[in-house]
């Protein structure tokens, strides 16, 4: 039996600024000698300090996700604290890593791209693929927590990945090469996983269900189910994507750990209750991907509307869109079933 895997993720704009702390954490974890468990480490970085610490990262086989938005113009929103362009330094460091540790680079390094008004899916994909032989993971800007006075500026910057991809003259080639990194294949995979009668998660699925399956409202994670994120101030969050107002507790070396499971359950259930009625009538409840903690004003006293709510007509369009995609791409079904869902 393969040993269980634990995952430690270092996530912030530039985690390498706190390298002594990272070393301390890893030394502590390694001193535990945990039986039957392999601990792996991951990090997201903009590569600014990569030249100083790449030896250590390669030694520990860090899973490294490098934030890069394409060529120099594409990447121009990423600047230093003094406002200077960071592209040349970032690229030089990534090039050095690839040259110095080619095997590590091939196995453990990937790229993350944020789409905005200075790049396109086409440009980013080709730049990173041609230079590094990697497929970037392309995402849109996070829409939560935007200040009211910055909303217009944000709207001008925002680009939808699926819409942008469809505008490319090489659309068909891109989605075929991107595969699960493309919104189309990602949606089809979820559609088949949830609604195809030929997908079985375990042997228990082979037995006929006598009653309808119950689903937890929304598509978010139950706290501590998948990961845990601790801020620099010691606040415990369910993950790095949600606001700090949804803190689960506090970890501070100078005081006792403040982590009440009952309070966490009460808070989580309170927010679920605010959406429960909508979830009961939502046609996407079986395959919901909406994290409730990313819904604006979830923590307010006002009544909220889930942006992922889907009525009968919208669901019909969702089914039609996925079926149409598989009709136009006859190999999509077999490819997803064999490569991803098998």
Feature names for model-found ranges:
Residues 235, 241-342:
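Flexible mid-to-C-terminal extensions adjoining Fe-S/redox cofactors in radical SAM and related proteins
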Residues 223-224, 303:
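Short acidic, Pro/Gly- and aromatic-enriched capping/linker segments at domain boundaries
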Residues 69, 227, 235, 240:
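Conserved acidic functional residues
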Residues 5, 29-36, 97-106:
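Alpha-helix termini
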Residues 1-7, 11:
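Single conserved hydrophobic/aromatic residue that forms the stacking wall/gate
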Residues 76-91, 95-219, 223, 229, ...:
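Radical SAM enzyme [4Fe-4S]-AdoMet core and its adjacent flexible, acidic
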Residues 15-60, 64, 68-74, 81-89, ...:
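Canonical radical SAM enzyme core domain
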């Amino acid at each position: 039996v393969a040993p269980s895997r634990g995952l430690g993720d270092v996530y912030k704009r530039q985690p390498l600024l706190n390298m002594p702390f990272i070393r301390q954490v890893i030394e502590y974890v390694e001193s535990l000698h945990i039986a039957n468990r392999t601990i792996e480490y991951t990090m997201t970085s903009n590569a600014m300090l990569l030249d100083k610490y790449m030896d250590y990262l390669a030694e520990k086989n860090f899973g490294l996700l490098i934030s890069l938005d394409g060529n120099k113009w594409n990447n121009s929103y990423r600047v230093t604290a003094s406002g200077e362009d960071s592209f040349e330094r970032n690229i030089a460091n990534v090039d050095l890593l690839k040259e110095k540790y080619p095997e590590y680079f091939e196995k453990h390094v990937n790229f993350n791209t944020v789409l905005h008004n200075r790049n396109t899916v086409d440009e980013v994909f080709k730049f990173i693929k041609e230079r590094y032989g990697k497929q970037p993971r392309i995402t849109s800007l996070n829409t939560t927590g935007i200040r009211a006075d910055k909303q217009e500026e944000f709207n001008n910057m925002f680009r939808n990945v699926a819409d942008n991809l469809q505008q490319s003259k090489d659309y068909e080639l891109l989605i075929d090469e991107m595969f699960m990194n493309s919104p189309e294949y990602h949606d089809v995979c979820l559609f088949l996983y949830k609604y195809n009668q030929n997908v079985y998660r375990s042997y228990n699925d082979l037995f006929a269900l006598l009653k309808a399956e119950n689903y937890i409202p929304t598509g978010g994670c139950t706290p501590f189910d998948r990961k845990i994120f601790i801020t620099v101030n010691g606040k415990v969050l369910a993950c790095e994507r949600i606001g700090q107002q949804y803190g689960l507790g506090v970890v501070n070396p100078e005081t006792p750990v403040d982590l009440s499971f009952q309070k966490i359950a009460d808070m989580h259930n309170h927010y679920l209750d605010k959406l429960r009625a909508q979830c009961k009538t939502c046609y996407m409840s079986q395959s919901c991907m909406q994290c409730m903690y990313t819904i604006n004003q979830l923590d307010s006293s006002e009544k909220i509307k889930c942006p992922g709510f889907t009525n009968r007509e919208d669901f019909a369009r969702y089914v039609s869109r996925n079926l149409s995609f598989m009709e136009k791409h006859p190999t999509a079904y077999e490819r997803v079933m064999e490569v991803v869902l098998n």
